[in-house]
Structure formats: structure tokens, C-alpha cells
Amino acid sequence: TCENTRYTSMFYWTIPAGFVTGRHVHRVQEETFYILDGECEWHVGDKTIRATPGTYLFIPPGVPHNIMNVSEKPARVLMTVSPPGHEHYFEELAELAAQGSPDPEALADLRHRYDTDQISTLTTRA
């Protein structure tokens, strides 16, 4: 987590089966992902990457991307973010989602605070 560093945070992210982040971009933040379990598809810029255990991805600032868990089981990912703190975005997003359909203004505020410009919506596969 970001509690003891000024530059990077590292954390595990469990991506539910069928979850899709929706296309988004970070103006300042850079991200790395290392796939531990499961199978995901990343759309990074104009490329599609099928990520299986052992795949490492780097997403620089300003590059639109989305992540989709294409398997029937949760995927586990080790994620780093610089500057640190993006793990709190996921924590707060989960809190909003637990209340039912998130309030659009609360969601927009959350995204603004965590350098996330959402281009398409969060979703799950049907």
C-alpha cells in the first residue's frame, strides 16, 4: 500500500469473473500488472493483449485502456501504481457498489480524486 512510500504502491487485485473496467485513462498515473491466476484481456491503446499467469503489462499515463476477466473464475493480479494510493479507489468503489447503484455524482467525484477519466462504463459480461 502507499502508507510507507511516496512513489509507488503495490497491492493484490482480485478481478471477478466477467468484470470489465470499462475504457479509461489516467492523466498522471502509471500502472503495472502481473497476472498471478486467471485469464484477462487488456485493451491498451489500439492493442489487445491476452494475459495469463506470468504476463506483465505496463500502462503509461495518457493511454486509454480497459481490463476484462474473460475466464469463469476470479483473476488475481499484482498491481503497482505511481504515484501511490490508487488502491483506495478500489476500496471506495466497492463501498459505493455495496450500496446498490452508485450515485453518478459520487462516482464522478471518486474518479476525479483518483486520476481516472472513464470513457466507457464498468460492466459485467451477460
Language-model segments: residues:
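Double-stranded beta-helix
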Residues: N66-A126
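Hydrophobic small-molecule pocket/channel-lining residues, especially in calycin-type beta-barrels
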Residues: C2, F19, E39-C40, N66
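A generic "binding-loop/recognition-motif" signal
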Residues: F19, V28-Q29, K47, V63-P64, ...
